[in-house]
Regions:
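Short, charged recognition helix plus adjacent turn
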Residues: 71-103
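Short alpha-helical DNA-recognition segment
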Residues: 24-43
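Short, basic-rich loop-to-helix N-cap that marks the start of a DNA-contacting helix
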Residues: 48-61
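A short, Lys/Arg-rich alpha-helix, primarily the initiator
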Residues: 1-25
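The alpha-helix within a helix-turn-helix
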Residues: 20, 31, 60
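The DNA-recognition helices of helix-turn-helix-type DNA-binding domains
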Residues: 37, 48, 74-77
């Protein structure tokens, strides 16, 4: 597993900087295109809401890319966050391979 100290680009940063800014659209316009509330888009853009499969499908359709693009972006961030959380890593360190656990 490759560990990096640098956090991957967040979903919100990607939506805002790589899509909304170049397309010159605001959160309200994106919300309308997606068929969701402006609050939902705001929460995505500010990192308060994670990408779900449904959201990935909507963003892919709106921006002309794939759902996997959005899901992979979310997954990379989730994994980075877990690997850089001492509390979560301490819990993972207690996990034993199944052969050891049953011996």
């Amino acid at each position: 597993m490759i560990l990096t100290k640098r956090q991957p680009v967040s979903v919100g940063e990607m939506i805002t900087e790589e899509f909304m800014v170049p397309l010159e659209i605001n959160q309200g316009q994106l919300a309308s295109a997606m068929g969701v509330s402006r609050r939902t888009v705001n929460e995505l853009c500010t990192g308060k809401r994670s990408i779900t499969v449904d959201t990935a499908l909507m963003l892919a359709k709106v921006f002309g890319n794939t759902p996997n693009f959005w899901l992979n972006l979310q997954q990379r961030n989730d994994l980075w966050t877990a690997l850089h959380s001492p509390k979560r890593m301490k819990k993972i360190e207690r996990v034993r391979p199944i052969r050891e656990a049953t011996a």
